[in-house]
Amino acid sequence: MTVRETRFPSSSATATQPDAVVRFCDTTLRDGEQAPGVAFTAAEKLAIAGALDAIGVHQIEAGIPGMGVTERDVLREILATDPKAEIVGWCRADHRDVEAAASCGLVTAHLTIPVSDLHLKSKLERDRAWARRRVRDCVVDGTDRGMRVSVGFEDASRADDAFVTDLAGELRDVGVTRLRWADTVGLLDPVSAYDRLGRLVRAVPGPWEIHAHDDFGLATANTIAAVQAGFTWVSTTVLGLGERAGNAPIEEVAMALRHLLKLPIDLDTTSFRTLAQLVVGWPLPAGKKAVVGESVFAHESGIHVHGILRHPATYEPFDPEVGGRRRLTVGKHSGRASLRHALEQCGITAEESELEPLVEQVRLAATRHKRGLDSRDLPGTSRAGRDAGPRAGTPTREEPV
């Protein structure tokens, strides 16, 4: 199997350096499928894994070997496609799970251990000493079986930082390839994330991964803060699919890293909308969804449309490179520039003196119908049909970029 290169920057490098490369571990097929009501068939898992591999994801957390025979069979099928991405099996810190992962032919396993006292005591009735022994023994078990092993610290945001730091150092010594810091219930904020995670990276150098949940709408922000603090891996899902409020969306994280932090992101971002449609179906669930939503490149305000027509960067932070299309809509907030442009697309040239009354008609019609106007109906506002006024519909003027 040809595995995509997963070398890491040196521990002295900060992720905000221009040459720093951030790696993606996508967990749509594991954490994403744990969202209530989500259940992928084997064929769907194969298709999604193939699409993630095609866009350049470095690791795909493809399932849970310990779930049973069916899950292990799907993992084997994914491995049989010979992906460039590393295929990872998610495991509890349990020798039975390690054995199950090895039986699939996986070369990479991810082990999870709770590190907060809340989880250890309330969920497992265990203590920190047990967690140390358990995860260390399972790491050794996995490496003895010839697997690359990473470890995730569950509920790290509510854990004692000193304990996490000590445990991380011990696990580095026994050969873990990477450590994952999980904000399991989304309690982190970007400022504390930058502070806490920066101290952690400095104390225990090496590859770290952030796994953020979106319970307070901060998963993407916390992921970006972690990268700024020195983390070199990010855990994501398509559209943020996941338990409760979900995870950090791959499309948001990738575009933020590329356009806000100016980091090299070696993913095919032009396929993000296609990937999202494959995972959740068509149409996409939210028009206002960041990066891939239907309304991300839609403009109605007269001031905005005027600016877009002169230079798209005036009101777009990035081009529709993710597979989207620019839409200039006509509605209540449209001005003369918007209407003139829409009419020109219909082959109509309006005199400047005609535009103002036509704009008023458009605004009245949009208010009455509570939606934008279809540019195909705008000829009804010309001299021949002005009395009828514009008809309401859906804004459909699209411009591929």
From Swiss-Prot:
GO terms for molecular function: homocitrate synthase activity. Gene3D superfamilies: 1.10.238.260, Aldolase class I. It is an enzyme of class 2 (transferase). Coiled coil: none annotated. It catalyses: acetyl-CoA + 2-oxoglutarate + H2O = (2R)-homocitrate + CoA + H(+). This protein is a Fe-Mo-cofactor biosynthetic component. This is Homocitrate synthase. It comes from Frankia sp. (strain FaC1). The lineage of its organism: Bacteria, Bacillati, Actinomycetota, Actinomycetes, Frankiales.
